[in-house]
Swiss-Prot record:
Protein known as: Methylthioribose-1-phosphate isomerase
GO MF: S-methyl-5-thioribose-1-phosphate isomerase activity
Pfam families tied to this protein: IF-2B (PF01008)
Catalytic residues in the record: 246 (proton donor)
Native organism: Thermosynechococcus vestitus (strain NIES-2133 / IAM M-273 / BP-1)
Catalytic activity field: 5-(methylsulfanyl)-alpha-D-ribose 1-phosphate = 5-(methylsulfanyl)-D-ribulose 1-phosphate
Record keywords: Amino-acid biosynthesis, Isomerase, Methionine biosynthesis
Binding-site residues, substrate: 53-55, 96, 205, 256-257
GO BP, one annotated term: L-methionine salvage from methylthioadenosine
Pathway: Amino-acid biosynthesis; L-methionine biosynthesis via salvage pathway; L-methionine from S-methyl-5-thio-alpha-D-ribose 1-phosphate: step 1/6
Amino acid sequence: MAVTANVGTIFPVVWAGDRVQLIDQTRLPEQYELREITTAAEMATAIRTMIVRGAPAIGVAAAFGMVLGAREYRGSDREGFLIHLENIASQLRQTRPTAVNLFWAIDRLLAAAQQPTPTLEELQQHLLETAQTIAREDVQTCQAIGKNGLGVLPKTPEKLRLLTHCNAGALATAGYGTALGVVRAAWAAGRLERLYADETRPRLQGAKLTAWECVQEGIPVTLIADTMAAHCMQRGMIDAVVVGADRIALNGDTANKIGTYSVALAAKAHNIPFFVAAPLSTIDTSIATGAEIPIEERHPQEIYQVGFSRITPAGVDFYNPAFDVTPAHLISGIITELGVFAPVDLARGIGAVSG
């Protein structure tokens, strides 16, 4: 039976004393369940199996995974501790190759580990405080993205009908959400008539997670199959599209959940603005274009099996990329915590605002 009762404010990754509590997103919407993670290896498994997912949330989870790994060290010398921490970082880096926030958070923890402290215990505490700061900053970042996104949405009609793909909500971040942060801001401002959510095959994050989040807060949501998005645009049912991102190249090319590119093409064909909402940490300044973004491929079972039932005949081959890359020319604006940038101005813009 689906969970429909309000579970309160959604925080998918929480430090709880000496462990991490994760909302098990593989169980939603049928069951709201918290998983307790006590080791770095357990965190790596949780990220790989998508118990926790969404680029910013993965980053926060990886940061706490580093903290758990640091607490597993049984030696007493700092050099051995740093080697141990590098090994933990290597394990976590191998979990999901596309989401750049994962690598950003791990690198931030490794940098924090260079902080001179009198004892290893104090260094471990410093790592925990750094991870908690990442989580806290992410919520604040998402709220700023929501505010900035609200400001760039079409001025007419007064009540907007927005479309989103996958889940870029509270479940995909430390809380509030990126694309759904914009939706939440529009709803709070009285500017949202309805959210249309693509179901997002093959893992159905839109159907299972985005719809669930909306139900928790009473946001009017209509679920559609991925193949219906262009039809809805053609019928004049969509005023703007807002999606999240897992990695953005310097030229604005954006990797997001598979199917996003198709939505962007349809939006362009119907002159509907298509926005990407993401924190600056999702922008990979080391790559020039989307051609350099590694695309994760997942097990074909996600395609051929629904629940416990196989839906395809034996002998069929499968191709299951988890992400696609939307070219920058299809994107109307990239909504960040520090403002909204046209893709062509992204590199110059982030340089200006970051000093």
